[in-house]
């Protein structure tokens, strides 16, 4: 079974040459780029953080919701005890997450002030927001640790909108710079 990959760089797809089987050549990503890899029925995103995003992530104090996950999520896929509390990562440079919203499985994707879906109501983001991830359907904006930080009227009162993005089982190979997605 092959692995489907699509790169998202500044809002445009890039090539799929960065993937082979269950390995993602994450060291070939530039900061601010994300690759999306099909794994079974779900897709996994790997985002390379900038130096500024890494510093900001390391300063994060965590959330009471970090260890919670939706009841519909398979219990064998979460929680992962090997990710750092602040960055929610195996290594600070990369954030690896399932592309589905913890609310209802809607798609979560990369967003930046330079490019976004202009047909969507983003008034809840206010001014000065940074690149991060967004669930357009439920109006939830996540920082680069995958924690929700802004909510629109559709999700503000939903407890599931307070949950962080879900992290797949994976490991980082320091010698090659590859991320390996682990299947259960």
What is each residue range found by the language model?
Residues 1-30:
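General detector of N-terminal leader/presequence modules that precede the first folded domain
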Residues 20-24, 30-33, 163-171:
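Short small/polar-residue motifs
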Residues 21, 34, 43, 132, ...:
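A residue-level signal for beta-strand positions that form part of recognition/binding surfaces
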Residues 30-87:
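Extracytoplasmic/periplasmic/luminal assembly and interaction segments
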Residues 62-183:
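Rieske [2Fe-2S] iron-sulfur-binding domain
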């Amino acid at each position: 079974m092959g692995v489907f990959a699509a790169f998202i760089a500044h809002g445009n797809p890039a090539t799929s040459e960065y993937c082979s089987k269950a390995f993602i050549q994450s060291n070939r990503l530039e900061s601010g780029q994300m690759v999306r890899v099909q794994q079974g029925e779900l897709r996994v995103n790997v985002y390379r953080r900038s130096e500024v995003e890494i510093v900001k992530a390391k300063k994060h104090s965590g959330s009471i919701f970090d260890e919670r996950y939706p009841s519909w999520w398979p219990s064998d896929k979460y929680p992962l005890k090997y990710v750092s509390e602040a960055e929610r990562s195996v290594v600070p440079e990369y954030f690896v997450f399932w592309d589905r919203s913890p609310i209802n499985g809607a798609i979560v994707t990369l967003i930046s002030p330079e490019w976004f879906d202009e047909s969507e109501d983003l008034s809840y983001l206010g001014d000065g927001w940074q690149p991060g991830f967004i669930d357009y359907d439920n109006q939830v904006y996540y920082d680069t640790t995958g924690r929700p930080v802004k909510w629109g009227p559709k999700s503000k009162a939903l407890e599931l909108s307070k949950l962080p993005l879900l992290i797949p089982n994976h490991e980082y190979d320091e010698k090659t710079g590859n991320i390996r997605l682990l299947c259960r």
